[in-house]
């Protein structure tokens, strides 16, 4: 009952846009994927960007996963599971014979260790807050314990979770990368470099990594589902400008241009004879936003933050993207349960923005820094925002850096006054409104290495978020969604963000790549390396 409600209440909007697979898979083949930015880490407890997310998904396994191209939850490392009527106890039975790539069998203690590692403050991972409902969470994060009392392993094949409160998202949490299972001996042997020397039980194995050039992955011959993955190897080439990658794809040298099609080339490619076969274009649970660091002046003043919300011309930014986005007015994207269709947010109003700045004592404006990634079109969008801010007296220096450097700046207290999130965030980890709160707007994300780059912490909203996620009764689906919707519209009164756009996902693939479009814009993986194949 609990499981059925969870799936039905969170996936309907997403599943409606996903096509059904029609092609028969074939085995074999080596593919080349390109990105401009290098990969920062493949450690599942730390990696949290849209580029490494797909690779981590395929290197490791978790208790739960999703049917390819959908948001349908299914057991993975777990062979079966049960949930108590009160939603406080989850018991999982593990598949037998699943092995790490070092040859050792996966056992229950590995699950416990891996989640404790993801939560432990010493790891400095951004995903600890997802496990906040597990008993003992506060003791582990507070440093009074090294273990999690809410995870029990009575034998090698059984894992039991005891929660302090019901959590309507908990099965989804066990499917995200932070719940990936790793072997302790491999983590210890890597001596702090597990992100470059990953050992997992997923479909792929990292064979070689030349920093700044390429990563080479091979299929795991011992993966527990025979015949998966379908491809033999994946070579990820980094340092590739999107335009160069597109030209190489057209020549047959590249199979997937991971950064998509540069907006300036999109209509040309779309209208070309090969466009229909090359372009994968679909909606996604995405919001692109500007973070305003609430802990540094002048963004500690709500009037300044509200003024910035009114200063940005979002329609112009959608034109930069050739219409591949729509203006956003709240953190939640339109397809997410809880989205408030009646909410209008802050309109584009230069005069009101100037008046608010004057009220805050900044009639002559101020100087600040706007961080952005350096992959097209993000610098151009940042420059458009810079021009809009200049029109109200705010002089913003655009600092366009590699993605990893921007993420590091955002997760360092006081480092980044403003960040344009384009190319980094936020695409839902799973299709539930809570995922647009905890990591990026909740108090738990406002930590060193976290993704709450506005460093916004509203304890009253945190309490309401916990109350919303504790609504695990099937009869309270609508109530829970409404509660989340009100949380997000109330956040906008504090204006820690400027929600700018809801963008479509566009990927370019070669004609030899097979499978339905939804596995190239997978709602929980981005690119699903487990399911793609060569024709």
Q: Positions of the model-derived regions?
A:
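N-terminal lobe/hinge region of extracytoplasmic solute-binding protein
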Residues: 34-85, 116, 197-200
């Amino acid at each position: 009952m609990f499981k059925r409600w969870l799936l039905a209440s969170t996936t309907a909007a997403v599943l409606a846009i996903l096509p059904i697979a029609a092609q028969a898979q074939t085995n074999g083949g080596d593919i080349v994927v390109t990105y401009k930015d290098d990969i920062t880490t493949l450690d599942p407890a730390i990696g949290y960007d849209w580029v490494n997310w797909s690779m981590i998904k395929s290197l490791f396994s978790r208790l739960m996963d999703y049917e390819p191209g959908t948001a349908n939850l299914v057991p993975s490392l777990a062979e079966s599971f049960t949930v108590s009527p009160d939603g406080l106890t989850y018991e999982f039975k593990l598949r037998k014979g699943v092995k790490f790539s070092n040859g050792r069998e996966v056992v229950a203690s590995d699950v416990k260790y891996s989640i404790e590692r993801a939560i432990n403050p010493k790891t400095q991972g951004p995903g600890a807050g997802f496990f906040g409902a597990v008993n003992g969470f506060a003791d582990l994060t507070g440093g009074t314990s090294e273990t999690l009392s809410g995870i029990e392993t009575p034998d090698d094949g059984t894992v039991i979770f005891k929660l302090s409160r019901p959590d309507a998202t908990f099965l989804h949490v066990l499917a995200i990368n932070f719940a990936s299972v790793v072997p302790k001996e491999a983590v210890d042997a890597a001596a702090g470099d597990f992100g470059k020397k990953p050992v997992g039980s997923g479909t792929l194995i990292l064979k070689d990594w030349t920093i700044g050039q390429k990563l080479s992955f091979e299929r795991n011959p011992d993966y527990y589902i025979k015949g998966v993955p379908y491809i033999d190897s994946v070579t990820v080439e980094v340092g590739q400008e999107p335009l160069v990658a597109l030209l190489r794809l057209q020549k047959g040298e590249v199979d997937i241009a991971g950064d998509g099609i540069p907006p300036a080339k999109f209509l040309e490619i779309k209208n070309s004879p090969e466009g229909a076969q090359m372009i994968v274009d679909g909606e996604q649970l995405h919001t692109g936003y500007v973070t305003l660091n609430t802990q540094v002046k002048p963004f500690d003043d709500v009037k300044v933050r509200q003024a910035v919300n009114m200063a940005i011309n979002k329609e112009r930014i959608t034109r930069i993207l050739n219409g591949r986005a729509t203006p956003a007015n709240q953190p939640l994207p339109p397809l997410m349960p809880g989205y408030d269709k009646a909410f209008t947010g802050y309109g584009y109003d230069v005069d009101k923005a100037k008046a608010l700045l004057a009220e805050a004592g900044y009639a002559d404006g101020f100087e600040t820094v706007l961080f952005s990634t350096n992959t097209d079109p993000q610098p151009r969008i940042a420059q458009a925002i810079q021009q809009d801010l200049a029109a109200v007296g705010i002089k913003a220096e655009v600092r366009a850096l590699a993605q990893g450097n921007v993420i590091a700046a955002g997760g360092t207290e006081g480092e980044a006054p403003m960040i344009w999130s384009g190319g980094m965030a936020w695409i839902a980890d799973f299709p539930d409104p809570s995922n647009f709160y905890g990591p990026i707007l909740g108090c738990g994300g406002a930590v060193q290495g976290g993704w709450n780059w506005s460093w916004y912490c509203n304890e009253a909203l945190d309490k309401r978020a916990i109350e919303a996620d504790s609504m695990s009764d099937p009869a309270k689906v609508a109530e829970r969604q409404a509660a989340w919707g009100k949380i997000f519209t109330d956040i906008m009164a504090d204006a820690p963000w400027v929600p700018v756009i809801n963008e479509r996902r566009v990927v370019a693939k070669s004609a030899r790549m097979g499978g339905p479009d939804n596995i190239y814009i997978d709602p929980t993986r981005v690119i699903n390396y487990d399911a793609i194949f060569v024709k």
